UniProtKB/Swiss-Prot annotation:
Sequence positions bearing N-acetylserine: S2
Species whose genome carries this gene: Saccharomyces cerevisiae (strain ATCC 204508 / S288c) (Baker's yeast)
Family affiliation: Belongs to the class-II aminoacyl-tRNA synthetase family. Phe-tRNA synthetase alpha subunit type 2 subfamily.
NCBIfam families, per database record: pheS, PRK04172.1
Region of interest (Contains the major tRNA-Phe binding sites), ranges: 2-173
PANTHER family: PHENYLALANINE--TRNA LIGASE ALPHA SUBUNIT, PHENYLALANYL-TRNA SYNTHETASE
Cofactor: Mg(2+)
GO cellular component: cytoplasm; phenylalanine-tRNA ligase complex
Protein name: Phenylalanine--tRNA ligase alpha subunit
Binding locations of Mg(2+): E416
Entry's localization field: Cytoplasm
Keyword line: Acetylation, Aminoacyl-tRNA synthetase, ATP-binding, Cytoplasm, Ligase, Magnesium, Metal-binding, Nucleotide-binding, Protein biosynthesis
Length: 503
């Protein structure tokens, strides 16, 4: 038994109840107290409860206001001294922080007004007031907080406002209330932690006391590799696709020609998506060869320039050299285009999917990265319709735990009709977009040589969005990139997409 544990038992024997360990043992920190109490509780010597008290301390700025007065009082006194004050001169005379906050709060309190000359002057209610008798509420409340006096009487809104203004900082004091346990005494017998063969053979265990198992304690963390959350969710998606009869497409070609990334998908060469601000172009090498399929190339040229297969085209001069430029693929539909072109050699119903990285030259923020993962599914069959697409989307997302979908018409260059897919998000209490879908255009499919009655459904969604929702990640940079915490990777649980993903 430690000296501190013995001190606690003696004080408890003297008082019957220790109402505040903070007051009784001020020289010991809360962690030392908690450790000693837990040890004594394991011996049934005592019981204790934790009491947390919220505290507030003045920041450097708050202490300055306490000593010098609030910004609004400084402004009012300056206006009284000068008579009037040009608004443009407030910042230069008082500084940007004092001027901005002081003006706002003085107007709010009704202490100042703006005249016809765009000057600040004292309001009517302060015209004949001695400013020394004017109550500086901000300063008074800060003094009250510093003295820890009647904090319960301060309105919560006022405290929140002071915190937002960074005039006070919230803290916490941990205290404990201690009472006697069922086996209380000031003597402490050491508890055995292991049952040995000698104890059993000599029956010595009958006279010993053993430390009870603590089933609530954390085990030692095993040092081992761990799967990234994106890999876990990716594997869930793969299993959903496999269970629905899909085959995975090869997706390891990150660099594509503009032909497969844009032209084969019926995206015109003047489309904004092909601009430098949206697409990463490869510097070395700059270009690559085009497909050897001359009929296919002629069809693409014709369908862009004057139209074919029921289309009037885009009516522009299509340039083969534009197709040869190398880019980091902006979507995984480039993979689908290659696979569908191969399918044209032996047309038949098929189901394909891919999950891999794509790249966009766009601003990075909490929900967008220049590099992310796209989940894409492609289903080809004879004489299927938009109704089949809707039904299939409902079945696909139901396996992810997402039901009650809504579909909204949208525009994609390579699908028509096209639909955005929305689901109700219980946490956000609103409909959120979870995917994009459509039927690939005849201009794209028939150019490849696919028969007219073989139609293709396609849809895609981000891998990051469901992962962020599942793991409650607010900033995508904490999920992917150099800011990811290794502790987060090692401790996150497995993901099951069929368990209320969007709730």
């Amino acid at each position: 038994m430690s000296d501190f544990q013995l001190e606690i038992l003696k004080k408890l024997d003297e008082l019957d109840e220790i109402k505040s360990t903070l007051a009784t043992f001020p020289q010991h920190g809360s962690q030392d107290v908690l450790s000693a109490l837990n040890s004594l509780k394991a011996h049934n010597k005592l019981e204790f409860s934790k009491v947390d008290t919220v505290t507030y301390d003045l920041t450097k700025e708050g202490a300055q206001i306490l000593n010098e007065g609030s910004y609004e009082i400084k402004l009012v006194k300056l206006i009284q001294e000068l008579g009037q004050l040009q608004i443009k001169d407030v910042m230069s005379k008082l500084g940007p922080q004092v001027g901005k906050v002081g003006q706002a709060r003085a107007f709010k309190n009704g202490w100042i007004a703006k005249n016809a000359s765009n000057e600040l002057e004292l309001s009517a209610k302060l015209q004949n007031t001695d400013l020394n008798e004017l109550t500086d509420e901000t300063q008074s409340i800060l003094a009250q907080i510093k003295n820890n006096s009647h904090l319960d009487s301060i309105d919560a809104k006022i405290l929140n406002d002071l915190k937002k203004r960074k005039l006070i900082a919230q803290g916490k004091i941990t205290d404990f209330n201690v009472t006697k346990g069922p086996e209380f005494s000031t003597d402490l017998t050491k508890l055995e932690t292991d049952l040995t063969s000698d104890m059993v053979s000599t029956n010595a265990y009958k006279d010993l006391k053993f430390k009870p198992y603590n089933f609530n304690s954390q085990g030692v963390q095993i040092s081992s590799g761990a799967l990234h959350p994106l890999n876990k969710v990716r594997e869930e998606f793969r299993q959903i696709f496999f269970s629905m009869g899909f085959t995975e497409m090869p997706s390891n070609q990150y660099v594509e020609t503009g032909f497969w990334n844009f032209d084969a998908l019926y995206v015109p060469q003047q489309h904004p998506a092909r601009d430098l601000q949206d697409t990463f172009y490869i510097k070395d090498p700059l270009t690559a060869d085009l497909p050897d399929d001359k009929t296919y190339m002629d069809n693409i040229k014709a369908v862009h320039e004057q139209g074919r297969f029921g289309s009037i085209g885009y009516r522009y001069n299509w340039k083969p050299e534009e197709c040869q430029k190398l880019v980091l693929r902006t979507h995984s539909t480039a993979i689908s285009a290659r696979m569908l072109h191969d399918l044209a050699k032996d047309p038949k119903p098929t189901r394909l999917f891919s999950i891999d990285r794509v790249f966009r030259n766009e601003a990075v923020d909490a929900t967008h990265l220049a590099e992310f993962h796209q989940v894409e599914g492609v289903l080809a069959d004879y004489n299927i319709t938009l109704g089949d697409l809707i039904k299939f989307m409902e079945e696909f997302f139901e396996r992810m735990g997402v039901t009650g979908l809504r579909f909204k018409p949208t525009y994609n260059p390579y699908t028509e009709p096209s639909m955005e897919i929305f689901s109700w998000h219980e946490g956000l209490q609103k409909w959120v977009e979870i995917g994009n879908s459509g039927m690939f255009r005849p201009e794209m499919l028939e150019s490849m040589g696919l028969p007219k009655d073989l139609r293709v459904l396609g849809w895609g969604l981000s891998l990051e969005r469901p992962t962020m929702i599942k793991y409650k990640v607010q900033n995508i940079r904490e999920l992917l990139g150099h800011k990811v915490s290794l502790d987060f990777i090692e401790t996150n649980p497995a993901a099951r997409l069929d368990e209320d993903l969007y709730e």
